[in-house]
Amino acid sequence: VVTDTLDSRTIKLLKNGGKVLFTPRKGAISKEMGGEVTLGFSTIFWNTGWTLHLQPPYAFGILTDPEHPALRLFPTEFHQNYQWWDAMLHGNAVKLAEIDPQIQPIVRIVDDWFQNWSLGLIFEARVGKGKILVCGVDLLSDRENRLEARQLLHSLTSYMETEDFDPRITV
């Protein structure tokens, strides 16, 4: 199941052994869970007042695990490149410590020096008998105009159909 909402039906599905890709709409994450973190493609290292849209960045970009099978069909290096532009503009940060501090994300958002939160963009866990893959990027809105979102969605859903989808952490 691919969903942008964690409702009672989705939780029941997970507890009974289902697989869920949770891809919330931009802005849908509560402040306590990371919603206060504003993402942008340029990092705060650069003077973002000079950027075209005066984006309000918060973080230093992302670090990925390019060898992780979830990204097998989404070409990437260990750091942010232009294929991540769309994800950063449509993404939500998730505070991993609020879920389980042991989670090692597939894609980590590098926080700034003021908060130094452990932030995830893509991570996985077990819930009951089921498995959840959380992608903080809204992969469902305006898909026909977002090639990168379609490809990332394809990569993640393909991964979920393999035996490699085997989260280590239970939440």
Language model: regions and residue ranges:
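Short amphipathic C-terminal alpha-helix that caps PH/PH-like domains
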Residues: 148-160
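Solvent-exposed, acidic/flexible segments
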Residues: 3, 146-149
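Catalytic beta-strand/loop cores that center a nucleophilic Ser/Cys/Thr
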Residues: 29-32, 42, 47-145, 168
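Short alpha-beta junction capping motif
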Residues: 1-45, 129, 133-135, 156-159, ...
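Short, intrinsically disordered, charge-balanced linker/junction segments flanking boundaries
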Residues: 165-171
